[in-house]
Amino acid sequence: MKVLVLNCGSSSLKYQLIDMDTEEVMAKGTYERIGEQSFVTHKVNGEKFRFDHPVKTHKEAIDFMTELLLDPKYNTIKSLAEIDGIGHRVAQGADKFSSSVIIDEDVIAKIDECAALAPVHNKAAITGIRAAMEAMPGKPNVAVFDTVFHQTIPEERYTYPIPYKYYEKYGIRKYGFHGTSHKYVSARIAELLGRPVEELKTVVCHLGQGASLCAVKGGKSVDTTMGLTPLGGIPMCARSGDLDPSIVTYLMKKENLTPDEMELILNKESGILGLSGVSADFRDIEAEAAKGNKRAELAISAYAYKVAQYIAQYIVSLGGLDTIVFTAGIGENQYNARRRICENLKCFGVEIDEAKNHEFRDEGRISSPNSKVEVWVVPTNEELMIAR
């Protein structure tokens, strides 16, 4: 069985075609800057190809993707009939979805209803779903929700201390995100350790442009940093993460801001970008900090501290800690970020091997033999989990 997985952003499209009999990735790629100077990076047979191919819509991007999949020189597939189904990543399912579902018009309407809690993510997913249905009519489309993995979080941890009527009326509670990634990584670390997932207490640190931590006990999410929306939790590249709520109303009054303007500041102008004044790219900030830029150094320190603070908090949530696992763009590639985070956790016996951490590539242990907690780097594979 061959499954095509689509992950749509507001101006991007990530795709993978997976042979589920072997779980082999037959082809994958990323379409970037849809609507502008679009280009696609296509990977097949261990080779990478880049095409500058401007498109205005996700439908046009999917059409060109299918051309690449069918191109005889790559020998991927001969016909779209070989694709048995299409899986879509959907960020927010709120309390409307407790599992993956086959998509129909009713499902699309409910995904749209949830969009108020993840407007950029859910709207993009709907765009991709519509485009896929149009490009490949008759194929079953399945929605896989980031929020489903967090359905096991206990009530006292997902409930906010505001009047309960707002939960009853509007469903205001912690939902969590990156569930597909957290599920994959927590299962993968059990495989790597050769231990049953049911006995492990793990904190997964999904550190990318968007970032969240998840406390996983026995293979189930028991707490996570993101909340009602993907804005909560640790500071991110451009998102604020957790704040004193009064900051929002104080700034709105002082700056005469509308709710939409305030939301834009918190989502697009905050986090390490807001602190550093340099960039939303961790690599740029590290380069500036190395030159002596104090605000860049402040951004890195604040980021590392907050991640470590949540890991420490989750030791209580888990009743102990066996493993810390770093994943996603920053977690997998920024050794200095991992080092700074773990330095804050020395009081818990966390110790990394500096050489392994610095030289590390791909997947493996970076903690020292003396560390009381194992520290690993495991590349995430959300697409495989969606396909499964």
Segments and roles (model prediction):
Residues 149-253:
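Glycine-rich phosphate-binding loop of actin/hexokinase-like ATP-binding domains
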Residues 322-345:
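Glycine-rich phosphate-binding loops at beta-strand->alpha-helix junctions
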Residues 68-83, 189-196, 311-322:
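Phosphate/pyrophosphate-binding loops at sites that engage ATP/ADP/AMP, CoA/4′-phosphopantetheine
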Residues 12-55, 227:
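Short glycine-rich, Thr/Ser-proximal phosphate-binding strand/loop in the N-terminal lobe
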Residues 353, 357-388:
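Glycine-rich phosphate-binding/hydrolytic loop that grips phosphoryl groups
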Residues 69, 73-121, 142, 148-157:
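Short beta-strand-loop/turn "lid" adjacent to the catalytic site in phosphate-handling enzymes
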Residues 9, 88-91, 207, 325-333:
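Glycine-rich beta-strand-to-loop/alpha-helix junction loops that act as flexible
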Residues 264, 271-275, 282-317:
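Adenine-nucleotide phosphate-binding core of ATP-dependent small-molecule kinases
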